[in-house]
Swiss-Prot record:
Interacts with host glycophorin. One of its GO terms (cellular component) is cell surface. The PEXEL motif is involved in the protein translocation through the parasitophorous vacuole membrane and into the host erythrocyte cytoplasm. It is found in: Secreted; Cell surface; Host cytoplasm. Residues 200-228 have a biased composition (Polar residues). This is Glycophorin-binding protein 130. Residues 117-140, 174-198, 264-276, 314-326, 364-376, 414-426, 463-475, 513-525, 563-575, 663-675, 713-725, 763-775 have a biased composition (Basic and acidic residues). It comes from the Eukaryota. GBP repeats lie at residues 226-275, 276-325, 326-375, 376-424, 425-474, 475-524, 525-574, 575-624, 625-674, 675-724, 725-774, 775-824.
């Protein structure tokens, strides 16, 4: 019994001891593992910091090297130019001195002989005949010596100090005037004395030539300057507080040598002190759509095209209540626009030898509503229409046409939308011509001249009418095929012209008139779009619009239309838009937008048959809208009871330079919302950020993008103010990203025989949550480089290939300042 108990005690004790040891050992092992892990983590963090530091140093070194290299290159270039100018100046001075030296030799020889003969006559009475003979012989010898010395001196001076002749001649003239006889006696001495004197002043002419060759540039202390660069067409933009400069685009192979269009748009909202301007060029519509900014801008032209284009358009509108003035002008080949509260200038379009037929710039517009802090950004490519369609925005559109293209284009567009509550109606844009009527009691627009066997059958129409009984909101929009001329302000104006090409538009005589008046708000809006040209009159009592470029055997049948409708049940917001023949597809949802373009190329899209459907349903704010645009055609339907949009064929030697414009502005009395938008045909340059903007380029190359086939989609959903809208527009390509406040734009390189099948898409998404509405949009033509953030900016270039844009050097500047809201 005892033994068994003892054994039991021992066994239990041993087991307890083992359990205790096992527990302690497990604890210690865990502690060791944790310590090892901590050491590893610390080492890893240390190594990662080292790596980051190394990469940072490398980045700084590379950045410094890049900056130094750029400065060195500029310094070398400047030194080379300066040395070349100085050398040219010295050559000119040497030539002048040689000519003067020849004249001086002849004068000195004649003078010395005359003085010697006079002295001989005086000495006749005193000297005998023998002395006379001797004196004559001596004098003759002296004169010969003097002449020889003068000649030798002149030769030596010409070789050594060719710049002293002028002063020598002056001294001789002074001696002649004084009439002193000492010149005859001391001719040798005088000639010797003149040498050192001339040598003393020999350096003065060189200093004068250097001073003449210098160039100085001085900027005033208060002068604000902003520069920006845009490729293909190149859209140079500067969008500062109040100023504006736009600017130049070099032209290539005998192109756009004379293009000089102008456009101006200004709009002001007394409540928010908001100014909005917009412009759309035919080849390019560069736009800046900030609180008060603006941008316009480019149009591509082709070989033997627009070489003499010189259209002008003026629009002026004045609203006695708000003191609003708006002017606008758009050339076909170029749409020059100035779109700032007070400033603007629009600009040039580069074109190349059979190049940039598809160039596509982008345009951005941004608007901010101080009450709701709303931001909107948008971008449209050349081939594509850059659009911004915010709470109350708009769209614009163009379609480029190419070599012998769109000769038979016959697209149509109709849009009819009716909102029983608000009685809203919007309508459309023609291909070759965009005929539009854009007012609550709107107007009819509409003619397009046709050219040498061109546009003989063009018959586009466009109507836009919108009425919002609750908010008294009115919106109009227009887009031409060749150009979309738009006026997008409560009382603003649009611009309008289209350059004409080879034996084109020589007789064009289109007219367009639109006048709208809202008795409550005293709002006037007019708009017009020509096919090759958008003829527009955009003022309460304004304007004439105007020209349409067409090409040799081009756009003979172009007839596209465009429609856009938007409904916002909560805010009673209405938006209308227009799309050109080339394609202006727009959708303007609760506050969104759509854009679209279609590039067409050599023997391309001759049979294009794209379709577009848009269906929108509003059921308890569950609104949805979709739309698509083909490359050859933009088919769109844009209404709750939507629409069909349509087709634009383009053909060989057609619409190569078509450029439409588009502008839209909408006001929401409750939220004081204003939005404008513009899209160029070849390029739509837009700036749509709180204060930033970029527009973007689309490179196109030799025989490139001939088969581009982009698509566009727009979908909008309004569910408890959760509105989303997307849109896509490729011309050759439409690259778009349109987030609530973000932006993505982007580049599309194209190469020789490249992007012939490019098919980019564009998305636009807009979200309204507690009135925090943001909309962004981007469209590249071949490429649309865009960045559209709430306040960001991206601009960007696309290099062009195959002997393209090698010399492009355009500049654009826009600056606007809003003192009240400090909006830029």
């Amino acid at each position: 019994m005892r033994l068994s108990k003892v054994s039991d005690i021992k066994s239990t004790g041993v087991s307890n001891y083992k359990n205790f040891n096992s527990k302690n050992s497990s604890k210690y092992s865990l502690m060791e593992v944790s310590k090892k892990n901590e050491k590893k983590n610390s080492l890893g963090a240390f190594h990662s910091k080292k790596i980051l530091l190394i990469f940072g140093i490398i980045y700084v070194v590379l950045l410094n090297a890049y900056i130094c290299g750029d400065k060195y290159e500029k310094a070398v270039d400047y030194g080379f130019r300066e040395s070349r100018i100085l050398a040219e100046g010295e050559d000119t001075c040497a030539r002048k001195e040689k000519t003067t030296l020849r004249k001086s030799k002849q004068k000195t020889s004649t003078r010395t002989v005359a003085t010697q003969t006079k002295k001989d006559e005086e000495n006749k009475s005193v000297v005998t005949e023998e002395q006379k003979v001797e004196s004559d012989s001596e004098k003759q010898k002296r004169t010969k010596k003097v002449v020889k010395k003068q000649i030798n001196i002149g030769d030596t001076e010409n070789q050594k100090e060719g710049k002293n002749v002028k002063k020598v001649i002056k001294k001789e003239k002074k001696k002649e005037e004084s009439g002193k006889p000492e010149e005859n006696k001391h001719a040798n001495e005088a000639s010797k004395k003149q040498e050192p004197k001339a040598s003393k002043v020999s350096q003065k002419p060189s200093t004068s030539t250097r001073s003449n060759n210098e160039v100085k540039i001085r900027a005033a202390s208060n002068q604000e300057t902003l520069t920006s660069a845009d490729p293909e067409g190149q859209i140079m933009r500067e969008y500062a507080a109040d100023p504006e400069y736009r600017k130049h685009l070099e032209i290539f192979y005998k192109i756009l040598t004379n293009t000089d269009p102008n456009d101006e748009v200004e709009r002001r909202n007394a409540d928010n002190k908001e100014d909005l301007t917009s412009a759309d060029p035919e080849g390019q519509i560069m736009r800046e759509y900030a609180s008060d900014p603006e941008y316009r801008k480019h149009l591509e032209i082709f070989y033997k095209i627009l070489t003499n284009t010189d259209p002008n358009d003026d629009v002026e509108r004045r609203n006695a209540d708000n003191k609003e003035d708006l002017t606008s002008a758009d050339p076909e080949g170029q749409i020059m626009r100035e779109y700032a509260a007070d400033p603007e200038y629009r600009k040039h379009l580069e074109v190349f030898h059979k190049i940039l037929t598809n160039t596509d710039p982008n345009d951005e517009v941004e608007r901010r509503n101080a009450d709701n802090k709303e931001d909107l950004t948008s971008a449209d490519p050349e081939g594509q229409i850059m659009r911004e369609y915010a709470a109350d925005p708009e769209y614009r559109k163009h379609l480029e046409v190419f070599h012998k293209i769109l000769t038979n284009t016959d697209p149509n567009d109709e849009v009819e939308r009716r909102n029983a509550d608000n009685k809203e109606l919007t309508s459309s844009d023609p291909e070759g011509q965009i005929m539009r009527e854009y007012a609550a009691d709107p107007e009819y627009r509409k003619h397009l001249e046709v050219f040498h066997k061109i546009l003989t059958n063009t018959d586009p129409n466009d109507e836009v009418e919108r009425r919002n009984a609750d908010n008294k909101e009115d919106l109009t929009s227009a887009d031409p095929e060749g150009q979309i001329m738009r006026e997008y302000a409560a009382d603003p104006e649009y611009r309008k012209h289209l350059e004409v090409f080879h034996k084109i538009l020589t007789n064009t005589d289109p007219n367009d008139e639109v006048e709208r008046r809202n008795a409550d708000n005293k709002e006037d809006l007019t708009s017009a779009d020509p096919e090759g040209q958008i003829m527009r009159e955009y003022a309460a009592d304004p304007e004439y619009r105007k020209h349409l470029e067409i090409f040799h055997k081009i756009l003979t049948n172009t007839d596209p239309n465009d429609e856009v409708e938007r409904r916002n049940a909560d805010n009673k917001e209405d938006l209308t838009s227009a799309d050109p023949e080339g394609q202006i597809m727009r959708e303007y949802a609760a506050d969104p937008e759509y854009r679209k373009h279609l590039e067409i190329f050599y023997k391309i899209l001759t049979n294009t048959d794209p379709n577009d459907e848009v269906e929108r349903r509003n059921a308890d704010n569950k609104e949805e809208l979709t739309s698509s645009d083909p490359e050859g055609q933009i088919m769109r339907e844009y209404a709750a009871d939507p629409e069909y949009r349509k087709h634009l064929e383009i053909f060989h030697k057609i619409l190569t330079n078509t450029d439409p414009n588009d502008e839209v502005e909408r006001r929401n009395a409750d939220n004081k919302e204003d939005l404008t938008s513009a899209d160029p045909e070849g390029q739509i340059m837009r700036e749509y950020a709180a204060d930033p903007e970029y527009r973007k380029h689309l490179e196109i190359f030799y025989k490139i993008l001939t088969n581009t086939d982009p698509n566009d989609e727009v979908e909008r959903r309004n569910a408890d103010n959760k509105e989303d809208l997307t849109s896509a527009d490729p011309e050759g390509q439409i690259m778009r990203e349109y987030a609530s406040d973000p932006e993505y734009r982007k580049h599309l390189e194209i190469f020789y025989k490249i992007l012939t099948n490019t098919d980019p898409n564009d998305d636009v998404e807009r979200r309204n949550a507690d009135n925090k509405e943001d909309l962004t949009s981007a469209d590249p033509e071949g490429q649309i480089m865009r960045e559209y953030a709430a306040d960001p900016e991206y601009r960007k270039h696309l290099e062009v290939f195959h002997k393209i844009l090698t010399n492009t050097d355009p500049n654009d500047e826009v600056e606007r300042q809003n003192a009240d809201n400090n909006e830029a």
